């Protein structure tokens, strides 16, 4: 087999990865000299860990072809050596599909062992994963494929009872209408699919340099999805050196080693479950990843008891569901030493129940796919653990807390969080406008979070400045919903709001003002939900409450303030 040259542009006319904003060389040099950035790629890190732990357990989980039926506890077990074999088979599958090193591959897999096989396989092969969620639908996937020029789309037919083949056909047809080449579909759950012979290590191609970095470790390794505050999720280019620094330090802070067993109940593709310290942190430490087919307490508790899992990352609604269930059932969670809670603010009253009910230490986590990650530490005062979201990973994480005019706020006062550092990006992929608004000229990322800093340095999240709904840790851009309503419905105005909810944090609400002389029918909610599904919107974004009004209320000075209006209507919908 001929290997790809470092200047390969990919198969079937696939374009090379476009340039994206990089950290200035002087700053990058400091990060190297400080030991934050090391000259190691994902391929090198994974092969090193495989060689060091070849006979140790790497992953426990269901297979994709067992998803339509069977028990949620039916599992396979792979050692690190077996994971390598499966990953090399996945790499062979990518090669047979026409993928070449440097090409982008959309990975849209549930929590099955195939997720790890194809993630590791893509990294070993030199393809760049684009981590989509199983919940994403045709509208979002069309955008991901078009913006990345993805060469392949890896799915598990039947996952979450969804027809991913039909989904692919739907958006592929739309791409072809635009003169674009759709990604090749790879269905890992197809029992008739040809099982390729795994590649040998010596057949792995040479890595491709993307964006001209002199060090391969400072090239992009994959594209993660942002939570999104405007439209479809933005693409986040993560480099080997920066991301692996975050993974290594997270694993150290969280005390991972070769005996660690992490239960992954949330979607594996989430940045939280991927790297904080997540799946990659466990693989770095030589531990085992326990994949739960669903996040229910029943499934999770059974796996914790059977596999002796000792760490579990959760979002607040899931943590609260575990607490409520544990109070009723008294499961054996004696192996669990650490429960991480992140993705949204965790109410102190709920946080206080983690240790007495689940029997594990609580660690609050506050981070973002763009970079900055904060953890409470093992030796933190209990009150800080219950009420704050921790301190940054790195001594070189820079944090600014500013008022609306861009001035530093007095210590202890809430303000807008801006940050830059050794693992925070300097810009999105292919998003010139968003880069101008989301990043300052000197490279600080405007997170959209409102925080206050305690004298100890701990950050406490008090709210959001950006227009975004946080539903069970899934971030939903209100502009996407409002634009869709204006485009597809007979309305003159639309406002999407987050409705406070104890179970999921916020539910999706939509307020509509019909055009003059137009009506939305007897059941506007049903009409909206059907229309949004037809547009290919992910189910978690579909409005759960719809209100029709003759006009939108004005502020006391006669103007429409979108920020005040959303707060006013959210309060009304919550009644």
Residue ranges, per PLM feature:
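Conserved ATP/PPi-binding loop(s) of AMP-dependent carboxylate-activating enzymes
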Residues: 392-396, 407-438, 476
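Conserved AMP-binding A3 loop
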Residues: 77-81, 221-248
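AMP-binding/adenylate-forming catalytic core of the ANL superfamily
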Residues: 136-143, 153-155, 312, 421, ...
């Amino acid at each position: 087999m001929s290997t790809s040259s470092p200047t390969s542009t990919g198969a079937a006319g696939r374009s090379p990865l476009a340039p994206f904003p990089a950290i200035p060389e002087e700053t990058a040099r400091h990060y190297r000299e400080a030991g934050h950035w090391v000259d190691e790629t994902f391929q090198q890190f994974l092969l090193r860990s495989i060689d060091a732990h070849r006979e140790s357990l790497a992953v426990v989980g269901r297979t994709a072809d067992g998803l339509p039926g069977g028990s949620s506890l039916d599992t396979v077990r792979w050692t690190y050596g077996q994971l390598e074999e499966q990953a090399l088979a996945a790499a062979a599958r990518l090669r047979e599909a026409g993928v070449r090193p440097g090409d982008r591959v959309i990975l849209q897999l549930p929590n099955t062992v195939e997720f790890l096989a194809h993630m590791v396989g893509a990294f070993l092969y030199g393809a760049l994963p684009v981590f989509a969620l199983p919940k994403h639908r045709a509208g979002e996937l069309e955008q991901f494929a078009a913006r990345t020029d993805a060469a392949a789309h890896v799915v598990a037919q039947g996952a979450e009872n969804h027809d991913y083949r039909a989904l692919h056909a739907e958006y592929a047809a739309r791409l072809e209408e635009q003169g674009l080449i759709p990604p090749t579909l790879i269905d890992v759950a197809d029992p008739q699919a040809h099982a390729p012979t795994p590649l040998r290590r010596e057949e792995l191609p040479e890595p491709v340099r993307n964006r001209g970095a002199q060090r391969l470790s400072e090239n992009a390794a994959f594209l993660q999805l942002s939570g999104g505050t405007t439209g479809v999720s933005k693409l986040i280019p993560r480099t080997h050196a920066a991301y692996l620094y975050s993974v290594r330090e997270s694993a150290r802070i969280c005390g991972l080693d070769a005996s660690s067993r992490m239960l992954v109940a949330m979607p594996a593709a989430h940045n939280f479950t991927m790297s904080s310290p997540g799946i990659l942190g466990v693989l770095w430490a030589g531990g085992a990843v326990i994949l739960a087919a669903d996040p229910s307490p029943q499934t999770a508790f059974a796996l914790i008891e059977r596999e002796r899992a000792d760490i579990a990352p959760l979002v607040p609604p899931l943590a609260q569901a575990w607490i409520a269930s544990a109070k009723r059932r008294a499961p054996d969670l004696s192996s669990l030493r650490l429960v991480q809670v992140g993705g949204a603010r965790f109410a102190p009253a709920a946080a206080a129940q983690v240790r007495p009910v689940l029997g594990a230490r609580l660690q609050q986590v506050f981070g973002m796919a763009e970079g900055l990650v904060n953890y409470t530490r093992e030796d933190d005062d209990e009150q800080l653990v219950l009420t704050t979201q921790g301190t940054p990973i790195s001594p070189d994480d820079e944090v600014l807390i500013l008022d609306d005019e861009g001035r530093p706020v007095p210590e202890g006062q809430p303000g807008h969080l801006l940050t830059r550092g050794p693992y925070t990006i300097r810009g999105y992929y292919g998003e010139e406008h968003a880069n101008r608004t989301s990043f300052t000229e000197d490279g600080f990322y405007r997170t959209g979070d409102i925080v206050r800093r305690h004298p100890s340095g701990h950050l406490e999240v008090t709210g959001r400045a950006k227009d975004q709904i946080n539903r069970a840790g899934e971030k939903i851009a209100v502009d996407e919903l409002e634009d869709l309503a204006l485009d597809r419905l007979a309305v003159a105005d639309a406002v999407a709001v987050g409705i406070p909810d104890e179970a999921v944090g916020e539910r999706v609400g939509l307020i509509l003002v019909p055009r003059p002389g137009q009506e939305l029918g007897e059941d506007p909610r049903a009409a909206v939900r059907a229309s949004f599904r037809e547009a290919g919107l992910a189910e978690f974004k579909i409005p759960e409450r719809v209100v029709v009004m003759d006009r939108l209320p004005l502020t006391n000075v006669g103007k429409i303030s979108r920020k005040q209006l959303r707060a006013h209507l959210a309060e009304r919908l919550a009644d």
